[in-house]
């Protein structure tokens, strides 16, 4: 395994956990691997350590190339900054897919809690014109995840929202709350999704 640290923006860093090239694995390494970008939770106030290395190593052991995103958090979590960070990460992984031996059509996002909200946000807002402009691309397909794994995610900004998470990423105006109520944004262009919760999660 080799690890690379890749600055994305003023407040965001992408850490890559990549399979090392070796004589024993060279034939296997010639095959492109799927990849996954992990977004830890933390209420958009911090990125939780417990949702970083453990899932990263698990996915790496499954044969994936793995990336962990430290995205912009409060007080820099407004104005779609975390979403832009994740979109930039997706764009970077796609653009360097040959170098990193990644199948550019098999790049998933995985998020935990508020990180699940972030991952799902890219799943429904990957073609947001403002985010595309900030990423310097007119090709929305570069930013679209091929699949999503949402782990006990924050989803709604409506009546039953996780208040501290949504307060850090959204304003109180109706337009903003509707934008971040992801259950209302699902369409036929939303990527295939595996979503799971636990019965003991009171949030």
Regions from the language model: what does each represent?
Residues 32-41:
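Short beta-strand element of the alpha/beta-hydrolase
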Residues 189, 194-197, 201:
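Short beta-strand/loop motif that positions the catalytic acidic residue
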Residues 1-31, 83, 158-163, 187-191:
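N-terminal cap/lid segment of alpha/beta-hydrolase-fold proteins
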Residues 156-157, 200-203:
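Acidic catalytic loop of the alpha/beta-hydrolase fold
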Residues 48-49, 69-104:
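Catalytic nucleophile-loop/oxyanion-hole region of alpha/beta-hydrolase
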Residues 30, 49-67:
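Short amphipathic alpha-helix adjacent to the substrate-entry channel of hydrolases
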Residues 35, 60-70, 108:
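A fold-wide structural signal in alpha/beta-hydrolase
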Residues 88-166, 173-178, 182:
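Primarily recognizes the serine-hydrolase "nucleophile elbow" in alpha/beta-hydrolase
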């Amino acid at each position: 395994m080799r690890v690379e640290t890749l600055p994305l923006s003023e407040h965001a860093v992408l850490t890559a956990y990549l399979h090392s090239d070796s004589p024993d694995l060279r034939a296997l390494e010639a095959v492109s691997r799927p990849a996954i970008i992990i977004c830890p939770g933390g209420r958009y106030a911090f990125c939780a350590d417990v949702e970083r290395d453990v899932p990263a190593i698990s996915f790496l052991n499954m044969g994936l190339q793995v990336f962990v995103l430290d995205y912009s958090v409060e007080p820099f979590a407004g104005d779609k900054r975390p979403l832009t960070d994740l979109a930039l990460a997706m764009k970077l992984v796609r653009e360097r897919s040959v170098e990193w031996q990644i199948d550019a059509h098999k790049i998933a996002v995985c998020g935990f809690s508020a990180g699940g909200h972030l991952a799902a946000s890219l799943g429904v807002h990957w073609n947001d014109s403002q985010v595309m402009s900030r990423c310097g691309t007119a090709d929305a397909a570069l930013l679209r995840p091929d699949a999503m794994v949402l782990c006990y995610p924050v989803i709604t900004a409506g009546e039953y929202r996780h208040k501290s998470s949504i307060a850090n990423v959204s304003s109180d105006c109706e337009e903003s709350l509707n934008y971040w109520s992801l259950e209302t944004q699902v369409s036929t262009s939303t990527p295939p999704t595996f979503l799971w919760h636990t019965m003991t999660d009171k949030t």
